Amino acid sequence: MIYSSMNLLSSAMATLLMIYLLSVKELQLGSYAVTITVFESIELVAFFLGSLFPFDFYRKLSIRSNLLFENSLALLMIISIFVWHNPIVLFTLLFLSSYATAISNPKSDTIVIFSIVEERQNAVFSIFSTIVTATVPLGAAVILALNQSLGATWSWTLLAFLAVFNIGYTCFWKEETRAVS
């Protein structure tokens, strides 16, 4: 559930940010096209660096700590959009978030694999991956509908509440350490 919620949050944030950047010139780096290019490049470089050169400190943290950090960064990104209107702050948070995600995603997959008995791993992991992957277009579609009906401010507010929910859920989430049969 937490992985689906995080995927929904990140895809909704990315979609809404692309729309929001059109109307908020303070967050743009020159033109809209340049800003989107920089946005995507920062994300790609951070994923690459996080995959190849992970910080040992972050890699050794529990998955709960990783999830708390990533959701906190998402909340900070939402706040930065409204409070600071500074593209450098936003892109720094994006880099940190993408870097952290690149480190923790393989760890999350490993936890799922090791918590399931070997005979059922393929089926359960396929279902898990399908559910988590399905939240990406769902997040984009839901936030587009909300943005059209409620506006950007309410949409960002709802995403902030989702980030807070994720943080609360993660605090009380019990990590599974035994194999499910």
Language-model segments: which ranges?
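Helix-loop junctions at membrane interfaces in 12-TM secondary transporters
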Residues: 81-94
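Structural signature of the two symmetry-related core transmembrane helices
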Residues: 65-79, 160-161
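Multi-pass alpha-helical transporter architecture, strongest
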Residues: 56, 81, 152, 158-181
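A single, central transmembrane helix in multi-pass transporters
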Residues: 1-48
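Substrate-agnostic recognition of the 12-TM MFS/MFS-like secondary transporter fold
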Residues: 2-14, 46-47, 51, 93-144
